[in-house]
């Protein structure tokens, strides 16, 4: 199972120890209990065995299960074992385990050293701050919970009834915009009525485009003129056109501003349109779309530079331009496999240019990472 694999990973980093045959038999029985989901039995055997590392390992595996343990136990484990793996998962479980029975003193002490990362954590922390009379801090956290949080239906109704006067209509729009970007459409639908009319119309158009339902043209026609160039609206129109293999998808990409949010999502759509354009034989247009990618860093930047270089090399036979893209890619990535890949393609471009010395230099860089 995955948990057995995780336990093996932890043990692999532990100091080498020699176990007696009895200890090994008990350890085997413990992990059989875990595989059978008999956690109480596994923890009893681990405690009885008296091996502190094994006991801690079994507790860690148990605490990783979602919603199974108390805030007190999880937070105590994190405090005692700050160097253990996957602590962010445990921190999230600790926050989700905070209940009405958890004292404000405990909640505030916890968040003094841990920034809230879950919806329940934000709500519990904000409410504890308000009860302590720390209104400015508390309202700030409550607003953040509303903007960033993902609530179940009943949880959302309770939260709104308690705190709806603590945030603004602008906060409602910030939340709605996020939910639409993230595809959380049921929650977005519930939030739509809390924003101004023009923004409701915009949100409705985005939602219909995302769902690929009827009435798209009607919804688009209703969008006010001053919102027609809203980047999120353009993104959904781009996705709709790309899914319907419309040639005019690239028109949206050609006119975009450079200061876009959600760059990775934009790149996914741009890359798909680039490949569609390439498949139709529009090679120069495909290259222009790829090379004007707007990406700044990370995996999407690397993919964009590679695709631009590949089109230049294989289709345009513009070897100098291809070499520039692959060199830029090499200079921007850090993982060995990425650097090896960039160097290999730079070598291919140098080979096409007939620059043998440069080609050999790039091939030498490519093989510096033998594990790739």
PLM features: what roles do these ranges have?
Residues 24-41, 174-179, 236, 240-243, ...:
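Alpha-helical segment of the N-proximal tetratricopeptide repeat
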Residues 1-23:
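Compositionally biased, proline/threonine/alanine/serine-rich low-complexity intrinsically disordered stretches
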Residues 12-19, 43-53, 63-67, 75-86, ...:
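Solenoid-like repeat scaffolds
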Residues 33, 98, 129, 179, ...:
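Residue at a conserved register position within TPR or TPR-like alpha-solenoid repeats
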Residues 122, 127, 131, 172, ...:
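Repeat-solenoid scaffold signature
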